[in-house]
């Protein structure tokens, strides 16, 4: 298993950060991908194509909350039982406003409904679960605002 830490840069938000060059961190410029800010259309499948060669092992940073749905994309690359741990300051399980598109607000609900590999820690189907609030992340500057963990 190769560990690849990824920085997915959609809006150049990381340009002001003093991130040292490191062979174990892959900086991926995604600013050329269209139709992916807040809502992700089918044309933005390019995101999955760019992540796939690196795999999902490692720590991944993606821009802002507008791109939280990238976690959902990553779950599609795993073909074994997984648990999803989600800490966020807003729900990612809303009903979609636009059915054909995935948003930063509805991706987790879609993963729960569609990913056959997603299970609770006691191997009960997630479809039997009620949504739970796992925590509240402060919105202060310089603080991580959301944490998504895929366990398998």
List each model region and its residues.
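Conserved alpha-helical scaffold segments that buttress catalytic/binding sites
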Residues: 2-152
């Amino acid at each position: 298993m190769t560990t690849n830490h990824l920085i997915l840069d959609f809006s150049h938000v990381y340009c002001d950060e003093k991130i040292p060059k490191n062979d174990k961190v892959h900086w991926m410029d995604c600013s050329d991908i269209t139709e992916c800010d807040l809502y992700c259309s089918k044309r933005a499948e390019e995101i999955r194509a760019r992540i796939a060669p690196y795999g999902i092992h490692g720590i991944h940073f993606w821009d802002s909350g507008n791109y939280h749905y990238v976690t959902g994309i990553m779950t599609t690359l795993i073909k074994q039982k997984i648990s999803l741990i989600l800490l966020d300051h807003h729900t990612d399980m809303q009903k979609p406003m636009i059915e054909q598109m995935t948003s930063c607000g509805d991706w987790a609900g879609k993963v729960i409904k569609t990913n056959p590999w997603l299970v609770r820690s006691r191997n009960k189907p997630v479809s039997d679960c009620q949504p739970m609030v796992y925590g509240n992340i402060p919105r202060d500057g310089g603080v991580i605002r959301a944490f998504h963990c895929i366990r398998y």
